């Protein structure tokens, strides 16, 4: 009978160990004195150890602090928890000096009907990335709200001014006020379009990949944007390799990426020319948009793909923009499984390009 009970107990213990090891969160179980009795693979990974956890005191294993960097007595937190308690304001110092943000669940192990704990369970979850994304989201919403508020206020003021001027018969000044309101509405529309594109790329929404003959696509984009270029006036040239071939990608993402490059080139090229180039190199094709515009300074080159970043150059500041264009371009390139390459000299223009495999 005793042997059978031991066998059942052993099987139950093995089941618990298997269950605990299947969890992705770090689990550490202690006796009533804080000595570790059970732990899982995730705990070993978090602590960056191969062995030596069993039989050690929980306080010796974990160096935790609050967000205010106050040391946290782990065993005290466990022993003071009459019921399950969760905290997400905990930092853990790693061996190489970095810190991670943890969510900790403290729980007593109650034996039978006793209110006295036989031991404790600590569950640790790494929430560093989740909190970082949460902070990014909050910052994004804050910046977007500010960026949208400004043109709305300017447009509202311009329209109110136009109404007053109309009442007084100042026809020309009414036209100027309406022009300003129109500029702000166009800016708003562009930002909303950028936000829509960004949302699609971050959620992974796109047309299914298809075989795309590049020459008709590039010619169509040239035809679409030629009037905008001519209005500045700028020369808009095509330089297409007749052997460019086809690619197998999302048409939506490819068009939006090229539109992004072309509109940027038109915006930041006060005079000269823009050239849309398609070049084949054996198994790949490189598509480039080259301009003779204001160029990008060396100090800005590694920041231009950051969200809401705009170069400090006064000519950039004089040109309206959302600061989302190149950030979105990078996202689109990632969806197309390619990388954007930029070459630029201040006052001499820029070239933006990417490479795709030829579809056979």
Each predicted region: which residue ranges?
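Short conserved segment of the HATPase_c
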Residues: 139, 296-310
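Short, charged amphipathic alpha-helical "coupling" segments at sensory-output junctions
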Residues: 2-18, 22, 129, 133
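Conserved catalytic submotifs in the C-terminal HATPase_c
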Residues: 210-213, 230, 235-245
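Conserved glycine-rich
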Residues: 336-338
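Short flexible loop/turn segments at helix-to-beta-strand junctions
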Residues: 172-173, 203-217, 248
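Terminal output helix/cap of sensory domains in signal transduction proteins
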Residues: 51-98
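Short alpha-helical segment of the dimerization/phosphotransfer core of two-component systems
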Residues: 180-188
